[in-house]
């Protein structure tokens, strides 16, 4: 759970910004989006292999990371 300590005299906006940043670092929103709809393990595995293939193609492109 993301928690933020509020200092004396700190505005709501700055506390809210800190909270949003801590949620982003913890990966809470991405986890919620991932769990929003059930995804079969076979579909998850297929997406993972497609992403790995895309990364491999990107790495093998000429001029990448010379």
From Swiss-Prot:
GO BP term, pick one: translation
InterPro entries from the UniProt entry: Ribosomal_bS21, Ribosomal_bS21_sf
Transmembrane portions of the chain: none
Molecular function GO labels: structural constituent of ribosome
Pfam families listed in its UniProt record: Ribosomal_S21 (PF01165)
Keyword check for Ribosomal protein: yes
Gene Ontology CC entries for this record: ribonucleoprotein complex; ribosome
UniProt keywords, alphabetically: Ribonucleoprotein, Ribosomal protein
Protein family per UniProt: Belongs to the bacterial ribosomal protein bS21 family.
PANTHER family: MITOCHONDRIAL 28S RIBOSOMAL PROTEIN S21 (PTHR21109), SMALL RIBOSOMAL SUBUNIT PROTEIN BS21 (PTHR21109:SF22)
Protein name: Small ribosomal subunit protein bS21
Gene name linked to the record: rpsU
């Amino acid at each position: 759970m993301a928690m933020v300590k509020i200092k004396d005299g700190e505005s709501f906006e700055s506390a809210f910004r800190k909270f949003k940043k801590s949620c982003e670092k913890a990966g809470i929103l991405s986890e919620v989006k991932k769990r929003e709809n059930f995804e079969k393990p076979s579909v998850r595995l297929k997406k993972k292999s497609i992403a790995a293939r895309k990364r491999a193609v990107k790495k093998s492109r000429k001029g990448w990371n010379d």
